[in-house]
Amino acid sequence: MTEFNSTQLRNLALVGHGKSGKTSIAENCLFKCGATNRVGKTDDGTSILDYEPEEVKRKMTIDSSLASCEWQGYKINFIDTPGYPDFTGEVKSALTACESAIVVVSATSGIEVETDRAWKYAEELSLPRAIFINKMDREHADFYKVVEELRAHFGKGIVPIQIPIGSEASFQGVADLITMNTKVLIKNKDLIYEIPEYMKDDVDTARHMLMETCAEFNDELLEKYLEGEEITETEVAAALIEGIVNAKIFPVLCGSATKGIGFRQLMNSIIEYMPTPYFRASMGINPKNNELIERRTEDAFSGYVFKTVVDQFIGRVSYLKILSGTLIENSSVYNSVSEKTERISSLYSACGKNQQAQKIAHAGDIVIITKLQATKTGDTLCNEEEPIKYEPVTHPASMFTMAIKADKKADEDKIGNALTRLVDEDPTLTIYKNTETGDLTISGVGELHLDVAIEKLLNKFGVTAKLYQPAIAYRETIRGTSKVEGKHKKQSGGHGQYGDVWLEFSPGELGSGVTFTETIVGGAVPRQYIPAVEKGVRETLQTGILAGYPMVDIKVNLFDGSYHTVDSSEMAFKTAAALAIKKGIPEAKPVLLEPYYTLKITIPEYYMGDVISGINTKRGRIINTESPSHDVSIIEAQVPLAELYKYATDLRSATQGRGSYTMEFSHYEEVPAKISEQIIAENNK
C-alpha cells in the first residue's frame, strides 16, 4: 500500500442509529474510490464489513469494522460501528481511535436513540463531527425538517454545506453551498452543473445560514458579514475548517446509499474540512514517574490498541491507532501496561475482512497487527526508551447478567478458556464465578449482547453453551431467642462419646455474621473443648434450617454444659453443638433474607415517572433523585436482587433505550412471608 504521512490521513467513525445506513455509506465510499468492485449490502450478506456469521444471520452490524481506502492522494480510515445499544462499547472504542465522526441520520426518521447517544459520546471526547442525512430517496424524506430537528436538539452550530436536488424518488444530487455548483448523478456518472434557477431561493436561504454560522465563530468573517462585504469561497472554507476543528460547527451533507448519490462529495468534504491527525497531541502518563506527558505526531513511536479480535486460526488480531512516531514491520515495541516486549512481524491495512500488507505506518494511521502475545485491548505500545501509558476507554456498565454453562459434557472443560478469549475480544463482557451458588455468570450490556456471545462461542471456539437465570445467594437469620441443650451421648461399653452444651441464640447486628461467645463458669465445659463447640456452631450454621442457606447476624452464647472425664472429646462437643442448633433455631423465629442492591439509574427527565413506578412494582424504594442537568435525571433506589432479573431490558423498554444504570450490593433484608414460603418450598422439593 502507498505510504501516507500524517497530513494525508483522515480517521472517521461512522456512528448513528441502527438501520440509518452507516455500513451502506462505507460500502459506497469503498466502491467510489475503487477499493471494491461492487457496493456490498448487509441485507443480502454481501457486505465486506458485516461478514461475521452473527452479522450475516441478523443482517446488522455487531462488531466495528475498519475500512481503509485511498482518495485523491489521501488515505481515509472509516470505522463502521453498530447502531444498537447492546454494542455501544464498540462505538466508544472506535471514537477514541478517530479525529472526527460522521453522524448518520435517516432523512425519514430524524434523531433516534443511538443518534443521541453517539453524539454525546463524541461530545465527551470533544471530537469534530459532520452529519450525513441518508435515505434522501425514500418516501417521506425531508431534509429541511431533519436539519431543523438537529439544530433544535444539538445547537445552532449544525449547518448544511449542501442541500438536496429533489427529494424522495426525484432525488438526483446535491447543491454545494461553498462552491455554488451542483453535483448530479446521471447514468452512474457524477456531473457538475451550475445552480439551476428554480433552486436559487433555497440555495440563497441555506447559504445565508452557512455564512451566519461561520461568521458567528470567526471575528473577521463576522465583520465582513455585518458590513455586507462579499465573502469568498476560500474564506468560507477557512472559517468552516476552524469551526469544525474546534467542535463549534457541524456541517450537514446528504445523499442516498441506495442510489449511490453524495459519496464523492462526502469524501471530498472529509479531505477538505475534517481534521488531520497531524495537529493532534495525545496525553498520557510516564510510567517511570507517573507524571503527565504529551506526545505529538513527530515524537517517538506510541500507539493505543483500541480493539482486539480473536481469530480461531490466526489468534489475537490487534487494531492499533498510532499516536506518535513511525511503526515499521519486523520491529520490536514495548507494551507499557504488561511491561513486555512485542515483535511486530507484519502490519496490515484493512478493508473489512480483506487485509493488505503495509511495510510502514506513520502517526495518525490505523493498522492491524497479528499474533501479539502480551497485548490486549486498552494497552499502549511504545518505544521502551521513551515509554508512555495512555488511559484506556471506559466501557458501558455490564447491566445484564445470566448464568452460563456448557450444553454438552464434552464442552465443560473448554468453556472457561473460550470465555476468556471472548472477553479479550469484547471488554464489555465480564465473567464471574460465584463460589457460593456455584454459578458461572456472564454479564453484558443487554440481552442481545449475551445472545450474540453464545453464538460466538459456537462459531469461533466450537463450544455450545446455554444461559439460565442465576441463583440468588439468600441468607437465613432469627428474629427471636431460645435456650436449648444439645447432648451427644454414646456409652455402650468401652470408650464412649459424651458432649453436653447449653446454647443461647439471639439476633445479631446487621452484617455481623455469626458471633460466638462463652460464659462458662466452674469448668462445666473444659476450656480445651470450647473451640470444638465454636467450630460445630459455625459449620452447622452454614446450612440454615429453612432452605439450606447460610445463617447470618446471629449471636450464639455457650453458657453451660457437662463433660465426662473419659468419654468426652472435641468431636463429641462439636456434634453436641450441631444438635443444639437443630433444636434451638426453629424456636428462635427463623426468617429468610434476600440481597438488596443500590441502583443508580440515569435517564432523560421525561421518563422519571415511569421508571419510579417500575421500581415500586419491584418492591424497591427510592432513596434519592437529582437532576444534574436540565434534561438528565438520576434516580437512586434500593431493590431486591430477585426483582432485577432482566431489569436492563425493562429499563430499555421504559425509556426507549435512553436509560442506563449501575448497581452494587447494599445489604440483606427479610423476605416477605408469601415470597419466603415459595422459596422455601422450592428449595425443599
Region spans (language model):
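Structural and coupling elements of P-loop NTPases
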Residues: 1-685
